[in-house]
Curated annotation (Swiss-Prot):
Subunit structure of this chain's protein: Monomer.
Family classification: Belongs to the HMBS family.
Biological pathway: Porphyrin-containing compound metabolism; protoporphyrin-IX biosynthesis; coproporphyrinogen-III from 5-aminolevulinate: step 2/4
Note: The porphobilinogen subunits are added to the dipyrromethane group.
Name of protein: Porphobilinogen deaminase
GO MF, one example: hydroxymethylbilane synthase activity
Keywords: Porphyrin biosynthesis, Transferase
SUPFAM superfamilies: Periplasmic binding protein-like II, Porphobilinogen deaminase (hydroxymethylbilane synthase), C-terminal domain
């Protein structure tokens, strides 16, 4: 028997609310009569908008307060962008479902100019170090400008910050109806996506069987295998979502292909690798590829990145 009511915890950004409302709509269609409500929660990542996330430091910048609400019993489930979800959870909580992935690529928003045709010294707005590293590897002449804010705010910074282009996740642009602004979708071999990019995760209390059964139908096995492999790689590298680590898994039949990438922020030093194997062994594959990358130079790269960020964090009052 389905639950009579369900409370969904979500951030209050435009994209987060779209995602939570999509989950709400799917639940209401599947369980007519169920009362589904949204509980908006402000996270530390929403409060600190004038500092790059990498400098704020820590993990779970967009989920911690939501998880605290769940532990208090204020919400039943939480809907997250998978790329924001840390690889470790508070005791008693966990990721129960990973939804089918939307377009995982990065998108270029410009004045109609494709990435390769952007002028020498072009100013590029981005919120992610892994994008910055990969794009500088290809175009070291470019100037990367860290931008924050919701999707629409970042799009508008093309004009307000006098940028030549802004790079955003295609999934958010498609969900919010901004695809007409896209000049080009970057292939995943040029800009490997963030871990989990394009997928949603639904978190709940692990001991609540009724809630788990209610949301089971959201899980998309192929996406879940791919994202679990990506997250295992990130976990083994001890990385948060604000370090220049990228990974992208693709499932074909019962096989999984995983590409991983670690780089210095300026893109001058990087290591990349690929592994294939049974999708059912997704987490083992992610860990194995991570160990290969770390051994091939990734460990030294990350040690330098973390040292730099630790020194910056000390300067920031939170």
């Amino acid at each position: 028997m389905a639950l009579k009511q369900l409370r969904i915890g979500t951030r209050a950004s435009q994209l987060a609310l779209w995602q939570a409302n999509w989950v709400k709509s799917e639940l209401e269609q599947r369980y007519p009569g169920m009362e589904v409500s949204l509980v908006k929660i402000k996270t530390i990542g929403d409060k600190i908008l004038d500092v790059p996330l990498a400098q704020v430091g820590g993990k779970g910048l967009f989920v911690k307060e939501i998880e605290e609400a769940m532990l208090r019993g204020d919400i039943d489930i939480a809907v997250h962008s998978m790329k924001d979800v840390p690889t470790e959870f508070p005791e008693g909580l966990g990721l129960h479902c990973i939804t089918e992935r939307e377009d995982p690529r990065d998108a270029v928003i410009s004045r109609g100019t494709k990435f390769a045709d952007l002028p020498q010294g072009a100013k590029i707005g981005t919120s992610a170090l892994r994008r910055q590293a990969q794009l500088l590897k290809v175009r070291p002449d470019m100037e990367m400008v860290i931008i924050r804010g919701n999707v629409e705010t970042r799009i508008n910074k093309l004009e307000t910050e006098k940028l030549d282009a802004v790079i955003l996740a295609a999934a958010g642009l498609k969900r919010l109806g901004f695809t007409e602004k896209v000049a080009e979708y970057l292939p995943t071999d040029l800009s490997i996506p963030a871990i989990g990019q394009g997928a949603l995760g639904i978190e709940c209390r692990l001991d609540n069987e009724e809630v788990k059964q209610t949301i089971d139908f959201f899980n998309h096995p192929a996406t879940a295998y791919a994202v679990r492999a990506e997250r295992a790689l990130l976990w083994r590298c001890e990385g948060g979502c604000q370090v220049p680590i990228a990974a992208f898994g693709e499932v074909t039949g019962s096989d999984l292909k995983l590409v991983g990438f670690i780089a210095s922020v300026d893109g001058k030093t990087s290591v990349r690798g690929t592994i294939t194997g049974p999708a059912a062994d997704c987490e083992k594959l992610g860990i194995k590829l991570a160990e290969q990358l770390l051994a091939d130079g990734g460990h030294a790269i990350l040690a330098e990145v973390y040292q730099r960020e630790v020194s910056r964090e000390k300067e920031i009052p939170v």
